[in-house]
Regions:
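Helix N-cap motif at beta-to-alpha junctions
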Residues: 55-60, 102, 137-140
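Helix-adjacent hinge/juxtasegments
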Residues: 59-100
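Short, hydrophobic beta-strand segments
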Residues: 6-13, 49-54, 90-99
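N-terminal, charged amphipathic alpha-helical interaction modules
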Residues: 36-66
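Short, Lys/Arg-enriched N-terminal segments with co-localized hydrophobic residues
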Residues: 1-4
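Short amphipathic alpha-helix segments
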Residues: 18-35, 67-68, 104-116
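Short beta-strand elements
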Residues: 37-43, 77-84, 122-124
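Positively charged, low-complexity, intrinsically disordered RNA-binding extensions
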Residues: 44, 94-98, 105-164
């Protein structure tokens, strides 16, 4: 009798469509704010980052909460954001916020070690920037999900592709 193993994947991904919507929303809010009229303050987005630009450093500090609120309203976990230093030079200020995705090797090793230490009948294997957990029983997999959720990692994790 061949038993098919149950499995799921652990990933850290962003919904880029929702990130773009949140940036658009934050720009609309900026344009309607009296204190930002004529400041050239703007949020711009590329594949892996969001850029904040304004005339003054204090404006960047005021823009960040607007962006965070727009992202949070769209279900984007703020742990995915890695804000850089604010750069100020001759009449302008910029900040780049990196959008972090994928589970890096260091965290993947921590999670696979945690699964091993749990003494459950499950295996964890690193697959690029995600982790696959396999086991015979669904409840063992659910116990592993709970175990991982109980840790506090500094990136958001999603549990996807559940098969049993």
């Amino acid at each position: 009798e061949v038993r098919i193993m149950a499995s799921f994947d652990i990933k850290s991904e962003l919904d880029h469509h929702e990130v773009t919507n949140a940036v658009d929303q934050a720009n609309r809010i900026l344009q309607n704010r009296f204190d930002f009229k004529g400041t050239g303050a703007v949020f711009s987005i590329s594949e892996k980052q969001i850029d904040l630009s304004a005339n003054e450093e204090f404006q960047i500090h005021q823009m960040s909460p607007l962006l965070n609120e727009s992202l949070a309203k769209r279900g984007i976990d703020l742990k995915s954001l890695k804000p850089g230093e604010i750069q100020v030079s001759g009449g302008s200020a910029q900040q780049t916020i990196d959008l972090q995705e994928g589970i890096d090797k260091e965290l993947a090793k921590k999670i696979t070690a945690l699964v091993k230490q749990s003494k459950s009948k499950t295996q964890a294997s690193i697959q690029g920037d995600s982790i696959r957990i396999t086991g015979k029983k669904r409840d063992e997999l659910q116990a592993i999900i709970q175990l991982i959720k109980d840790q506090s990692y500094d990136i958001p994790l999603q549990f996807v592709n559940f098969r049993d």
